[in-house]
Amino acid sequence: MENVLRVVILGFIQGIAEFLPISSSGHLLLLKKFMHIDLPIVFDIYLHLATVLVVMIYYCRRILELVAVLVKFVLGKTTECDFAKLRLILLILIITIITAFIGIFIEMFKGLFTLNLVLINFIVTSILLFLLESRIVIFDLKRNILLAGCLIGTMQGIGAMPGISRSGITIFASVLLGFSRSESFEISFLSLIPIVFGSLLLKYKELFESDMLFSIFEINLGAIIAFLVGLFSISLFVKMLQDSKLYYFSVYLIILVSLVYFLF
């Protein structure tokens, strides 16, 4: 029964924090420290598959459009009206490549992330969200796909650090480069799909070496909860982004850091 409660909490946190700009990795690290458990790799994989499934459902039509354009490109049948979608595909490809290099580098040092460093990263995320809702300088660089992809990919790679919100930092970078909020949201979450599947491939070997702390039922339960909560969270994030209310998350992170620092 204790394990059931744990997977419910972990699934809920993953579903909330993966989509809202508050860092799922940072929150899960806090939970692991305070619950005194190490997440088995298979459970981590299931949680991420659940959340990426949310993105694929939310952007189902958009993904099908991009796949169709890609097929037309391979067959040499693209038209002028397909160029915008091809640019988006190229942008996501560049972002994915840059993110992968930086993410692999950060993964090598993930065991060195202390609680204090995670709290500092929470503060950094809070500042970025505050700046996103402020009158920050906008650079009109979105037409330069290579430069934009490299910069956004770099930010998304940094987002692999626990406490740094991947969605928050990529949306911040995209808006800074001149993309609209809706475009930035789309870029952030469409680029999540190849990154998650790529990271799962890298963890494939570990899957057979990890201990089964949770039962199959408990693992599936956690994934289902992460999926259902994620469906709600992604819609909530869209609304709050459109309404310019991301400062709520900025305040939340400062409160969280204060509570953890002074109480623990």
Curated annotation (Swiss-Prot):
Q: Where in the cell is it found?
A: Cell inner membrane
Gene symbol of the encoding locus: uppP
* Transmembrane segment boundaries: 7-27, 39-59, 89-109, 112-132, 145-165, 182-202, 212-232, 244-264
Give the UniProt record's GO annotations in the biological process aspect. Answer: cell wall organization; peptidoglycan biosynthetic process; regulation of cell shape; response to antibiotic
Q: Which transformation does this protein catalyse, written as a reaction?
A: di-trans,octa-cis-undecaprenyl diphosphate + H2O = di-trans,octa-cis-undecaprenyl phosphate + phosphate + H(+)
EC number(s) of the enzyme? Answer: 3.6.1.27
Q: What is its main location?
A: membrane
Q: Does the keyword Heme apply?
A: no
* GO MF term list: undecaprenyl-diphosphatase activity
Q: What does this protein do?
A: Catalyzes the dephosphorylation of undecaprenyl diphosphate (UPP). Confers resistance to bacitracin.
Q: Which InterPro entries match?
A: UppP
Bilayer topology term? Multi-pass membrane protein
Spell out the GO cellular component terms annotated for this protein, sorted alphabetically and separated by semicolons: plasma membrane
Task: Give the main EC class.
Answer: hydrolase
Entries under Pfam families matching the protein:
BacA
| Other notes | Bacitracin is thought to be involved in the inhibition of peptidoglycan synthesis by sequestering undecaprenyl diphosphate, thereby reducing the pool of lipid carrier available.
The entry's keywords: Antibiotic resistance, Cell inner membrane, Cell membrane, Cell shape, Cell wall biogenesis/degradation, Hydrolase, Membrane, Peptidoglycan synthesis, Transmembrane, Transmembrane helix
Q: Which organism is it from?
A: Borrelia hermsii (strain HS1 / DAH)
What protein family does this chain belong to? Belongs to the UppP family.
Protein's name according to its UniProt entry: Undecaprenyl-diphosphatase
